[in-house]
């Protein structure tokens, strides 16, 4: 019998295009499907040449390396023909088999999946997110440009920008997210853009100049500031960033957590060190709507 693509197959292919690389547990969690069912369907899509897979580096996990999947050229062509991807986007921009930042991308994926889950746990919330390397993001909002006190133009890309709208309070909160795996320098005398201290300073300029208010036009909302979120890979890196945040007053807009906290209690729980303060009770980015929302 000839292979036929189901609507759920197009949903899976488009999701992988949006997230760039994924694992079967991520797809199962996001699409609310069984892990076995997702693995089986991935296998068929690989056989049909629409997807490819590769072994993820062993990293911190024991046993066999986790498999990651990504679009193959015929998969890209199909999504373009169906209108899911704009035809002018180069295939080379969509497929990157080198995966220099696969651990970073996969952790960013988990953040997005957790945020998506929050919407099902807390009715009345609307969450809108822009990922820095999404195929579907407008170039206008893929980066932020600010001008330093010396007149230097500084351009930087948050790993993700998202807003949470509470329909009960009719209030929108804006968040910038930085996923940190401990590969960047905390503070360099040269103040390079990847220096975490400089990153925080850049966001401070974004606040002072109210550059963040351009998202009001995108999401048709009113914004009064934002929160800068750091999600770290390890407790030790969380401690380092918290220490840095406490040194850089005012730092109340900086919130820090660690991935194990997110996986255990969910991204909306009281897992965040506000202002880098570890000597006070952790808080929730949802404030009074705080809730535990671990993935099923």
Roles of regions detected by a PLM:
Residues 56, 132, 178-182, 233:
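Short loop/turn segments at strand-loop or loop-helix junctions that form parts
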Residues 123-175, 198:
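Active-site metal-binding core of divalent-cation-utilizing nuclease and nuclease-like domains
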Residues 13, 185-192, 201, 210-296:
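Non-catalytic C-terminal interaction segments of nucleic acid-processing enzymes
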Residues 94-100, 133-151, 183-191:
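Surface-exposed cleft-lining segments at the edges of enzyme active sites
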Residues 157-159, 174-191:
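Active-site ExK catalytic segment of metal-dependent nucleases
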Residues 122-125, 169-171, 216-225:
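Short helix-terminating capping/connector loops at secondary-structure junctions
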Residues 1-99, 105, 296:
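Nuclease-adjacent, charged terminal/linker segments that flank catalytic cores
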């Amino acid at each position: 019998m000839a292979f036929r693509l189901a609507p759920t197959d197009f949903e899976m292919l488009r999701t992988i295009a949006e997230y760039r690389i994924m694992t079967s547990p991520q797809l199962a969690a996001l699409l609310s499907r069984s892990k076995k069912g997702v693995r089986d369907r991935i296998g068929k899509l690989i056989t049909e040449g629409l997807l490819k897979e590769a072994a993820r580096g062993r990293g911190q996990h024991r046993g066999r390396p986790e498999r990651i999947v990504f679009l193959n050229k015929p998969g890209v062509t199909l999504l373009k023909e169906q209108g899911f991807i704009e035809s002018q986007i180069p295939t080379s921009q969509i497929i990157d088999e080198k995966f220099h930042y696969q651990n970073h991308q996969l952790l960013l994926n988990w953040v997005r999946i957790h945020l998506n889950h929050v919407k099902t746990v807390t009715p009345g919330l609307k969450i809108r997110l822009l990922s820095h390397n999404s195929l579907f993001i407008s170039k206008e909002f893929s980066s932020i440009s600010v001008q330093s006190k010396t007149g230097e133009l500084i351009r930087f890309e948050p790993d993700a920008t998202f807003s949470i709208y509470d329909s009960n309070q009719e209030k929108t909160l804006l968040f910038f997210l930085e996923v940190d795996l401990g590969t960047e320098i905390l503070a360099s005398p040269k103040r390079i853009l990847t220096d975490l201290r400089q990153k925080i300073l850049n966001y401070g300029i974004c606040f002072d100049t109210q550059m963040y208010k351009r998202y009001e036009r995108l999401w048709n909302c009113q914004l009064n500031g934002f929160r800068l979120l750091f999600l770290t890979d390890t407790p030790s890196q969380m401690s380092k960033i918290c220490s840095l945040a406490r040194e850089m007053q005012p730092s109340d807009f900086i919130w820090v957590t660690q991935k194990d906290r997110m996986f255990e209690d969910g991204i909306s729980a009281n897992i965040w060190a506000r202002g880098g303060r570890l000597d006070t009770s952790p808080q929730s980015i949802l404030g009074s709507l705080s809730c535990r929302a671990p993935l099923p």
